């Protein structure tokens, strides 16, 4: 009975666990795993195919080859289970134990484990405080290590060469000291190590040392020693005495035809180890000469090294086909390794794949499934149903019936498939909408039919795409597929909350065509009582589709949640719109569709419908729209021919004008008036403008036609040109493509992004000549190459994002924090990109929002901003709102739903258990792939925007400046001398409506608070050069200006003015060595007082003379700008990657470390010394390279975090000096800029979620009374929790600073070592985890997938919560039950003994 209980307990124990710990295995542990020692290198007998005894496949050690049969076949079948055959020694059991049972090899000499030796930082090196080189010399028998110096003058752990060793022997004798070679020496040192003493010494040393390098080293060692003490790992276990042998079925040996064998590389590597080990054992028995034994030990060490990690040290061991053998490390790492190939990616049963075709008659939740496929996929259900209905007596009969395809099978199939959802998946699955559930309709043929409206979500088209079908088997799986994954339940895009079920292409074309209006049509002016009457009239041929008519319509109002008809009115409309109104759901205003319906209108319609109606109505409406769109696009017969591409008459004239302008500039260049760079920029500018003009002329010509109305007058109306209608409706093509068809192709880009200055003046209708065709090939080729290369990049970015966000799940409803981020409207130049209402929609307020200019509360703290609130916010003109954010959430594991806000894909507050980290990663990664493929479609036509050289405002209002430093020049205009200035325009409500950046050197024509009118020019600048402005009046002195050596003096042929040009450093002669040309500004009266110095780059032009007196605001020098490059996402995707990897840009901006007054100290040879004196009088010094332009002057007061020297921002500095909120705003803004450029809409919250994960770690500056070490990097939440405990105990708190980690680094630094190991650098992660005895509590999604459990998200989240609760309850119950049972058993035993 007790044994039974024991077995029962063991079985339970195996099933349920909450964490996985990894550590170093002791020799005893390895022996305890083992079922026997492998002593021979033989594998199997090549004649009998039986395993050799005590060999690598021995059945006695690893278990039987066949189920329940010993090797000699004495015992067969189940009745002898667990019997050990006395003849061959094999246990009779399942043959699958050959996948589980391990063996071992007793090593004749200890061997160091290569992971702990070579995986950086070397654990052995750290622990023994020796360099890796020294340890290797000992290990590979090149030097002796003193393990016990005795009373000699030798030092512990001293290295001795052979010569030194023998000298020491002669001097001291061999009893006085001990020195050894090989792993044995290392093992001795490690086993003698007393970790507690070592830790105490290290603590003392770190307190006493002044050297930063030593402190770092001590802290590193202390961390390792502490973790060894805490984990119970012994250091000497890093040296192996016993080597475990992998179960044979994990390193199989398969006989091929012709007497050959296919074998796993591991068998070869094990054979080498066993051979060398046996040879060494024999040599030791024979007492062979030391040198031979040493050599054999070294070879054994190398053999074990290559078994564990081949190629890590020295040359790889090659197989017979000249490729390196795959070692144990190779088996687990990389894409083909155990983690990514078998644990995270598994093949799926009950699946099929086929080509997809369009199913225009399907409902949104349906797909067409070929009968042949369904028959195969639903086999088990069919067998069951055939048996239940009594059509087949056994499974065998059912199987025959299905194979012969008898008629009743098809009836059963219909019944089985009815309302049984299947999953459709299209690779690449970039976001969760790449797998959706549909109800199958059985169809003839072999292609899967897909509903056209879900193509957007799958990114599918019908040009040969394939899709896979999966069948959910269990009831629960079917239920989840139906409720969560059915296509009709996934109407919104999870990245932006916009509808994704939007009709496109032909459907849009049909709707657009039917809702266009035309004058002088049959039936014009008729009045219809309702839409059905209009439809009847149209179908009977009494009116045409585009005729202008009057229609009586009904308006609806919402009463008690239902739409009731309220008023009737007559509207002017067309027959087509009247027909379309028949499918409009009650409650949607007719005014929404009383226009030509383009793609945008349709998208808005679905959005409004989803927000005001129920989900079902929206889905039905989308379907109805699709059917109608297809019907009328077929009826319209829209197609196009070459005559539809109208070439504007004015084109030739425009091109001639442009050529003349280019010729003028060319002449100016040949006279030397302009530099080559300026000429190039101007030429590009002319052609860009001309291209735009031609395009505009073409659109005007193609977009309008003359029609004769009923009175015989001519009217210019929107054209019915096919090409125009396709582009205007948004069905096919764009104005950019039309421009190339019938305008001019314009400028082309070279593969490096620079623009070729000869444009293609022809279009595709005229045809290209040889030269133009050749220029075109550049862009076309770049498009294809880009697509191939960038898809991989984008996929890798998504993988890193998923990895960093995978363990972030909504775990509670509200964390109760008051923190949040301040949101403002997004304004770019003269247009509002996103209003404040849109930005805050679906977010929870972090504080009370007041009405403008009053104390009345408009939205209370903790309110979820709804659609109505969002509109109200815009109306009221509120400036900014503080909302809760994932970044500032206080939940321990995960995020609370209040900090996250709305679920983008559902439109209501997010539920507990949603995997927001993965959703965020998919939302950011999915468009990445699309963006990378963007270049390809426009065929490389250059998209250089015409150069902007001024700010012209669009609205009347008041101008305000931000961060503006300026000086007044002699014309009384302001000259800007700050680099991050902006001008904003506010309307009469005080709302900011426009915002522009102002470059350094710009001239401002309006004062702060000055009124401006629309179209006023308020700022202008030279777009082709960067000026250097004099900030004070004074005298100019040239330093190191030597004509012909450092500068050239040239004369402008037009103006006759002379100017200096720098000679590029690379081209200067030796005479220029040590000369650094610069301009000094000194006081006019006293040349000793230096006002400022300006270092000059090599491309500069100077229009001044030496000793010239100038006023403030004058231009000292001009630096020509870089040549125009096209803006393309190629720059965008790496930009996003750089932001998420938190990379420091080269020459990044320098920020002020503290608030205070600036002064300049004595400078060194290459650096300037900047001194900031704060209010307490403390001075902080900063050293800045001399070639950096410094934007501050002596005596200026500046704020912490201000920019001293311009450049790309460094996110680490922003976090350190300006805080988490500033960093969050910076990353969100920069990432959004890249995506917005491509017209992709992503919600800010997804980017915030990733930033939260990047901010997981902190650096401990002062450990206070905690157990942390100064300088240690640890989890933010752990520090917060420890601080709470310390505060309660009244102890000193930890002082820390937040760290920003790139997504790769953050993924590797996650608390879960399983997740990190499956991501990258597997061996390094596992080495670190095992030495520190890491415990993985299986919090994230990845770890749970790997150990084969439900993920703790969605329905799995509840499952794990329930499981934990049950576990706690069962422990208390089990203890009681066990106690009672034990009492009863004791009683029974006592009674039996008495009896």
From Swiss-Prot:
CDD domains attached to this UniProt entry: RNAP_beta'_C, RNAP_beta'_N
Binding positions for Zn(2+) 2 per the UniProt entry: 815, 889, 896, 899
Family: Belongs to the RNA polymerase beta' chain family.
Gene3D superfamilies given in the database record: 1.10.132.30, 1.10.150.390, 1.10.1790.20, 1.10.40.90, 2.40.40.20, 2.40.50.100, RNA polymerase II, clamp domain, RNA polymerase Rpb1, domain 3
InterPro entries cross-referenced by the UniProt entry: DNA-dir_RpoC_beta_prime (IPR045867), DNA-dir_RpoC_beta_prime_bact (IPR012754), RNA_pol_asu (IPR000722), RNA_pol_N (IPR006592), RNA_pol_Rpb1_1 (IPR007080), RNA_pol_Rpb1_3 (IPR007066), RNA_pol_Rpb1_3_sf (IPR042102), RNA_pol_Rpb1_4 (IPR007083)
Keyword Metal-binding: yes
Co-factor(s): Mg(2+); Zn(2+)
Keyword Nucleotidyltransferase: yes
GO CC aspect terms: DNA-directed RNA polymerase complex
Residues holding Zn(2+) 1: 70, 72, 85, 88
UniProt catalytic activity: RNA(n) + a ribonucleoside 5'-triphosphate = RNA(n+1) + diphosphate
Lineage: Bacteria, Pseudomonadati, Pseudomonadota, Gammaproteobacteria, Candidatus Pseudothioglobaceae
Cofactor binding, per record: Binds 1 Mg(2+) ion per subunit. Binds 2 Zn(2+) ions per subunit.
Subunit structure, as described in the record: The RNAP catalytic core consists of 2 alpha, 1 beta, 1 beta' and 1 omega subunit. When a sigma factor is associated with the core the holoenzyme is formed, which can initiate transcription.
Pfam families: RNA_pol_Rpb1_1 (PF04997), RNA_pol_Rpb1_2 (PF00623), RNA_pol_Rpb1_3 (PF04983), RNA_pol_Rpb1_4 (PF05000), RNA_pol_Rpb1_5 (PF04998)
Function: DNA-dependent RNA polymerase catalyzes the transcription of DNA into RNA using the four ribonucleoside triphosphates as substrates.
EC number(s) recorded for this UniProt protein: 2.7.7.6
One example GO MF annotation: magnesium ion binding
A single GO BP: DNA-templated transcription
Keywords for this protein: DNA-directed RNA polymerase, Magnesium, Metal-binding, Nucleotidyltransferase, Transcription, Transferase, Zinc
Binding positions for Mg(2+) per the UniProt entry: 461, 463, 465
The protein's name in its UniProt record: DNA-directed RNA polymerase subunit beta'
